UniProtKB/Swiss-Prot annotation:
UniProt-annotated stretches for the region Disordered: 1-29
Biological source species: Solanum tuberosum
Family indicated by similarity: Belongs to the complex I NDUFB10 subunit family.
Purpose of the protein: Accessory subunit of the mitochondrial membrane respiratory chain NADH dehydrogenase (Complex I), that is believed not to be involved in catalysis. Complex I functions in the transfer of electrons from NADH to the respiratory chain. The immediate electron acceptor for the enzyme is believed to be ubiquinone.
Bilayer topology: Peripheral membrane protein
GO cellular component, one term: mitochondrial inner membrane
Assembly and oligomerization: Complex I is composed of about 45 different subunits.
Cellular localisation: Mitochondrion inner membrane
Chief localisation class: mitochondrion
UniProt KW keywords: Electron transport, Membrane, Mitochondrion, Mitochondrion inner membrane, Respiratory chain, Transport
Lipoprotein as UniProt keyword: no
Protease recorded as keyword: no
Entry protein name: NADH dehydrogenase [ubiquinone] 1 beta subcomplex subunit 10
């Protein structure tokens, strides 16, 4: 939630995939 949002505000995470930005969220689900 909020912490991840702050991460995106500061810059994409190291494992951020521009082709599938929600891959990490889906993995948690």
């Amino acid at each position: 939630g909020r912490k991840k949002g702050v991460q995106f505000d500061e810059g994409a995470p190291d494992d951020f995939d521009p082709n599938n930005p929600y891959k990490k969220d889906v993995a948690f689900l």
